Swiss-Prot record:
One of its GO terms (molecular function) is ion channel inhibitor activity. It comes from the Eukaryota. It is found in: Secreted. Keywords: Disulfide bond, Ion channel impairing toxin, Neurotoxin, Potassium channel impairing toxin, Secreted, Toxin, Voltage-gated potassium channel impairing toxin. It comes from Centruroides bonito (Scorpion). The record marks 31 as: Aromatic residue of the functional dyad. This is Potassium channel toxin alpha-KTx 10.5. Disulfide bonds join 4-23, 9-28, 13-30. Pfam families: Toxin_2 (PF00451). GO terms for cellular component: extracellular region. Expressed by the venom gland. Inhibits less than 5% of human voltage-gated potassium (Kv) channel Kv1.3/KCNA3 currents at 100nM concentration and does not block human Kv1.1/KCNA1 and Kv1.2/KCNA2 currents. Has the structural arrangement of an alpha-helix connected to antiparallel beta-sheets by disulfide bonds (CS-alpha/beta).
Amino acid sequence: NVACVHRTCDSNCKRNGYKSGKCINRKCNCYPH
């Protein structure tokens, strides 16, 4: 399993139309859902 990198997570979420991304338990979570 790949460790979550906040910068990558955040930009992936933004590219998918979310406001921001945050790493929780090594997984990328996009907000707001």
